[in-house]
């Protein structure tokens, strides 16, 4: 057992088997509140633990975990779900050849053995299923596919799964199902959850119909039309603090990229700081106002251009309440520094939360969809008693293209997978933010790629916002709010939590200098075997 650093509020426990991982997960679930643990993300051989750093620390958690008996404990047994599969996958013949058996035997092994969901990750509703008897252990594809259809039934390593949505992927495809394993309109969007038992049946041999949970019809929004959107800019989304505690469904937190700016916008207006606002990327939002209201704009620096019904024009200040009247138009100019601005209204936007949040997750495609031209927005009741704030100001210095931004990082959990020279390059060389960057992550480019010391395949393990993942090309990807919950490339370090807002405001062609706050060091209790 090893205890590896992840961030100032997270550690990773590395174990020797999936059975140990599930045993530890089972024990941690019983100690979440007592040990001040906020969330756990189990994976194939690791458990990522996010904790409250004010109430506990990594060393204390490591010592507590060392007292646990991991010889007992298993995946809780859940409901049985039957999935009908058409076994016509593109990789079926490869799987048979790799295992030295016939295609028919592959299908028999997959259908004659019950699977159980060990954990969820990669994408919402993506379940990693295991079977003690199926004997279908195959490697991932060397070259991942750009697009795998939703419903594809696949194998990789010791796991089987069903792709919940169309997405890239590197698993071996053996079939496809019509079952909707992820649908946000169901009461429980994810068909599978940890503990679920799964029985695959061959659709070609069965005429029986299997009924899955009913899908609710979407409710139409008949709200009033307080604001009409005339232009959206590059991207405008609803965002709040995000989805906390949804890791069991394979969903990361998402939420506003610059939470300090979101909170300031709401404090300016007397709203609760988590009230949903518009996150506008690179400016360009233009709206028509259809009633009197109070707004505020914070975050990335831009002009707030207002034209009244009578044609008068003026520029309003950021970080201040702005009174608007019916007939006004508001247009945000091009961004001068930073990337994302936040527009809030007093009382808040009328938006229905999805899985506890009004944020749109661009990777998971969960939440109210992106704002479109012609869309109308409604405001909730403005009958709030809190006073406005006139003393708000930016919490960070917003960088401009070409600037060098210094980000503090914690080294780990897989720093020791890289050569000493790669670790040196990570912190000494400048990394340019490329145009391929988005809310999922900043794709960086450096003069010299980072090289690995350990070349074996890394079993999927949990990730966090700020994680610096190093894919095969050696050029880092800095994970931001919409990052995948688990990943299969090693994480060399992570941006400290207090610099995450700044990370979300770094523009294209700015450069990043990573500043380690300490050396890579495992926590006390590492390498103690309890089983």
Task: Tell what function each PLM region has.
Residues 1-531:
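Conserved "landmark" site that anchors the functional core of diverse proteins
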């Amino acid at each position: 057992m090893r205890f590896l650093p992840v961030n100032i509020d997270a550690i990773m426990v590395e174990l020797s088997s999936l059975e140990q991982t599930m045993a530890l997960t089972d024990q941690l679930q019983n100690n979440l509140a007592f040990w001040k643990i906020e969330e756990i993300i189990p994976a194939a051989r690791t458990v990522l633990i996010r904790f409250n750093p004010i109430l506990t620390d990594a060393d204390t958690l490591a010592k507590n975990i060392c007292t646990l008996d991991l010889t007992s404990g298993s995946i809780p047994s859940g409901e049985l779900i039957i999935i009908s599969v058409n076994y016509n996958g593109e990789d079926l013949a490869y799987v048979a050849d790799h295992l030295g058996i016939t295609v028919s035997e592959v299908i028999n092994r997959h259908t004659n053995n019950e699977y159980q969901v060990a954990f969820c990750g990669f994408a919402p509703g993506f379940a990693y299923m295991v079977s003690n008897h199926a004997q279908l252990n195959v490697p991932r594809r060397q070259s991942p596919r750009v697009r795998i259809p939703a419903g594809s039934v696949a194998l990789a390593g010791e796991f089987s799964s069903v792709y919940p949505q169309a997405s890239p992927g590197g698993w071996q495809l053996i079939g496809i199902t019509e079952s909707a394993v992820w649908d946000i309109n169901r009461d429980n969007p994810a068909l599978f959850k940890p503990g679920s038992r799964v029985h695959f049946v061959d659709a070609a041999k069965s005429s029986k119909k299997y009924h899955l949970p009913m899908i609710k019809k979407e409710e139409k929004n008949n709200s009033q039309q307080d604001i009409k959107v005339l232009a959206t800019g590059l991207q405008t989304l609803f965002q709040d603090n995000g989805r906390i505690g949804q890791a069991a469904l394979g969903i990361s937190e998402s939420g506003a990229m610059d939470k300090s700016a979101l909170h300031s916008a709401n404090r300016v207006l007397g709203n609760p700081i988590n009230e949903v606002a518009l996150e506008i990327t690179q400016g360009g939002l233009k709206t028509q106002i259809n009633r009197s209201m109070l707004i505020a704009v914070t975050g990335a620096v831009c002009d707030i251009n207002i034209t009244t019904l009578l044609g008068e024009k003026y520029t309003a200040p950021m970080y201040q309440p702005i009174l608007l009247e019916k007939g006004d138009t508001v247009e945000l100019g091009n961004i001068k520094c930073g990337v994302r601005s936040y527009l809030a209204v007093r009382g808040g936007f009328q938006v229905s939360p999805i899985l506890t949040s009004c944020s749109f997750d661009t990777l998971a495609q969960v939440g109210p969809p992106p704002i479109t031209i012609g869309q109308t927005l409604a405001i909730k009741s403005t009958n709030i008693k809190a006073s406005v704030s006139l003393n708000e100001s930016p919490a960070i210095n917003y960088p401009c293209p070409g600037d060098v931004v210094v980000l503090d990082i914690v080294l780990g959990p897989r720093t020791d997978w890289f050569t000493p020279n790669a670790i040196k390059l990570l912190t000494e060389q400048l990394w340019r933010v490329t145009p391929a960057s988005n809310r999922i992550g900043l794709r960086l480019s450096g003069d010299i790629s980072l090289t690995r010391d350990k070349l074996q395949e890394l079993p999927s393990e949990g990730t966090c916002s700020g994680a610096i993942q190093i894919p095969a090309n050696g050029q880092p990807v800095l994970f931001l709010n919409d990052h995948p919950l688990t990943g299969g490339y090693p994480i060399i370090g992570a941006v400290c939590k207090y610099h995450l807002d700044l990370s979300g405001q770094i523009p294209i062609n700015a450069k990043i200098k990573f500043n380690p706050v300490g050396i890579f060091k495992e926590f006390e209790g590492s390498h103690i075997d309890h089983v």
